[in-house]
Amino acid sequence: MNLERIIEEFHQGHSLNAYEVFGAHFVDGGVRFTVYAPHAENVWVVGSFTNWDENQILMERMNFQGVWTITVPYLNEWEVYKYKIQTRTGNILYKADPFAFYSETRPNTASKLVDLNKLTWTDDKWLQDRSLNFDKPMNIYELYVGGWKRNGEHPYSYDMLADELIPYIKENGYTHIELMPLSEYPFDGSWGYQVSGYYSLTSRYGNPQEFNRFVDRCHAAGIGIIIDMVPVHFVKDDFGLRYFDGEALYEYPNEYDANSEWGTMNFNLWNEEVRSFLMSSAAFWVN
């Protein structure tokens, strides 16, 4: 991995793999945290491993464009964390990681450490044959995972979904499953269309390893997966992207353009880093 090149492409607006640098990554010696906060005076990592504010960890400014980073030793998977950001006006914000790969279940809002290096795939045959299917008919079954079937008061997990959905798809002649957004979101009623975590698999139905298993089983059955994405707007919740470092960053700087008709914030697509953030998110889910 060429860290410097990825960061350069991130700032230029055409990165497809910014997630390889940003976020929380298990590396030799601990977990490397990297976040983009150009307007911040200081950034700390806080979480279950620091007893939150008691032992906060100050991050280092990596470049003049506002990338902050720190490697923290001796951390465990599934620990929770946030970024504590001091703005230019001296205010303190607590923000979830924009590049988090997993998050707490609502109403909690912290990011969670997860080691994606542990994901294993057995779908080589599917990937090899995929290019042979471009000129074949498609029959797509779209579903909202939270509403397809219920297990009492709870939605199906990814494992339960695979057990019942795959036979149903095969029996009815569908070739692909289109899943409504699976990126983390705080409001159940949005069905995932008001996103807070663009790299974070929603924790409602299971963890990344369990989703990995679901996709593997679908591919083994010859079923393709399509994931819906929402690269237009994001939630206004205080823990999220809105005024991430105390000033407009992911959203437009003026209120008229920033506010959408859905009560959310519009992404500022003129911003190079925002474009890289969204394009890398799409590539992350595919990869």
Report each predicted region and the residues it spans.
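Short, surface-exposed loop motifs enriched in S/T, G, D/E and P with embedded aromatic residues
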Residues: 54-63
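Short beta-strand elements bearing conserved aromatic residues within extracellular beta-rich modules
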Residues: 43-45, 81
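Glycine-rich, histidine-containing beta strand-loop boundary motifs that form or position
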Residues: 35, 47, 72, 85, ...
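Substrate-binding/active-site clefts of carbohydrate-active enzymes
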Residues: 125-137, 144-287
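Short proline/glycine-enriched turn/loop motifs at strand-loop junctions of beta-rich domains
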Residues: 36-43
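The feature marks proteins involved in alpha-glucan
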Residues: 1-32, 62-142, 147-155, 160
